[in-house]
Amino acid sequence: LSPAIPAAVSRGSVAEALQSLINISAQVSVNNREEPVNRVRIALEAYLDPYLGETLGAAQAVEEVRAAGTGYSARIALGFPVGGYQAELQAALAGQLATAGVAAPLAIELRSDIRSHAVQRNLKPLGEISNVVAVASGKGGVGKSTVAVNLALAWAAQGARVGILDADIYGPSQPLMLGLSGQRPSSPDGKRLRPLASHGISAMSIGFLVDAEQPMVWRGPMVTQALTQLLGETEWGALDYLVVDMPPGTGDIQLTLAQRVPVAGAVIVTTPQDIALADARKGLKMFEKVSVPVLGIVENMSLHVCSNCGHIEHIFGAGGGERMAREYGVRLLGELPLDGHIREETDGGRPTVVAAPEAPRARPYFEMARRTAAALATRARDRSSVFPKIVVEET
């Protein structure tokens, strides 16, 4: 620092020389404080989040790092519901710092930053609904509706605003599963319907509008029209996710829905057995055909838990969902159990994540929900709102 004094004195000002020394000293002090903070930021950004499948740096999740007392604090924003994730992430990041040689306590402020993601070409997201997620299967009987309702309820429990649309016109299940059988939605203006509420989510189904025992003897065009009306003429309000419980199969109805409804991502539900996997592959290829990204595979009835002794058995085989996910380069989002309690809870109108959120059988649903939302968070975001609307007028 000594060379700064002669330079200043040569200009005839001792005061300027002293001020120069003070400024240099202050800058050195700032740099000394910022260097450890930057070191902490680099370590945090290098953390590979197990749900996102990418580093916090790649996800641009680390918003701020600062010194706080004898340690550090960090503000982190993730693109999926973070309820219940704070303690797990805090412990993981503390370990990350220790590995990087930073021996100081860390406190994190964690929040969700759920954005709207891109949908099929020529379609736009629906109003205040950020993301429509379709839950589909190639065949019936694999537990798709149970997966869909627990997915929606798990997201709500983790802090998201969620709705569910029962798109199975021929066999609606959600009224029973949500404990809403016999209830009817209101219509204040006679044009739009208000969804029913259950366990913190909004719900709409053709089952709310017809008698439970009335068969829907409709042809395909009538079904797609009815579903389009249920989707577009319901006052959903602001939602982070709208889960669409799709009808089983891959026929004209499913294809038309996939083309008309702006879907941000699809979840394919299957069981481990080969016959279910064969149809699940058809469902996956259908979404690929209409440019809907498949977020991943959910293997339902992955294992059976005996209600008497707790013995675990793979009744329908093992590893089918994992093999299919690897074959098509998508994620395995979850392996869910076949448990008698799940059936009882769902039939009783209180699905597992609501009826027994702390039970071991509920944990796979919460994990599946977080993996699904994280898979969507890594997809391209919707940019349509940033472009101005162009109107051409003849003069």
Report the location of each language-model feature.
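Walker A/P-loop phosphate-binding motif and the immediately C-terminal alpha-helix
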Residues: 132-169, 189, 284
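A short, charged, Gly/Pro-tolerant segment at domain boundaries
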Residues: 371, 382-395
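Phosphate-binding loop that captures ATP/GTP phosphates
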Residues: 155-218, 224-225, 231
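Phosphate-binding/switch loop-helix module in NTP-utilizing enzymes
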Residues: 210-257
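N-proximal, solvent-exposed amphipathic alpha-helical segments enriched in charged/polar residues
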Residues: 14, 18-63, 95, 99-100
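Extreme N-terminal, non-catalytic leader segments
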Residues: 58-61, 68, 78-79, 85-134, ...
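C-terminal boundary of histidine-terminating zinc-finger modules
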Residues: 349-358
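Conserved catalytic-core segment of NTP-binding enzymes
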Residues: 87, 91, 236, 240-241, ...
